[in-house]
Amino acid sequence: MIKFPEDKPRVPKKEPRYFFIYGKPMSGKTFFASYFPHALDINTDDNAEQSRVPFVSLLKDENNEPVSDIRGRLFEIIKGLPQTSFKTVIIDTIEDVVDAITKQITDEAGEKYISDGKLSYGKGSGMVKKVINDLVLDLKALPVNVIWISREEEQTDIASGVTKNIPALKQKYYNIIAGNCDLVIRTQKT
């Protein structure tokens, strides 16, 4: 005979720590993320001044000059996090991070597009994917909450005419990031 557990809530062994939040602009993504404990916003879209969360600009340095080594800056931030009191890292927005990494890789290769010349046959895309994988794994190794923020876009199925809201992050990168998250959240204004 099977022995049933008691009918009472259990205390989970692990709280969710990895979140993917997406929504339309100004739908409260960063605002919601700002309520996580001791948050640091790694920002790409210049709206950090509107938030109550301390931030580091990924695309501009402390002198407001453009950063050319995005990968180096990302991993410099990650390397320095254990020496701080931050308990939450917000990546705002992940599609801008992917675009900046793609630009850096194409610039370094002297190519215009990620599939041109030295980067053809999937080499360039593979390089971007590796940087994203490394970023996910490096952040998961830290004892912090990680919040990935993405914008939202509409996708319409031409055959059925049905429109659905999806993250603006390309599917192949969404699968890597959301596959390592405990929860995917969509924000919307009511």
Regions found by a protein language model. Give the residues of each.
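Conserved P-loop
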Residues: 2-100
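Alpha-helical scaffold elements adjacent to nucleotide-binding pockets in ATP/GTP-utilizing enzyme cores
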Residues: 73, 97-100, 135-138, 176, ...
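Catalytic-core regions built around general acid/base machinery
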Residues: 131-143
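Loop/turn-to-beta-strand initiation segments
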Residues: 85-88, 142-148
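Phosphate-binding/switch region of NTP-binding enzymes
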Residues: 146-190
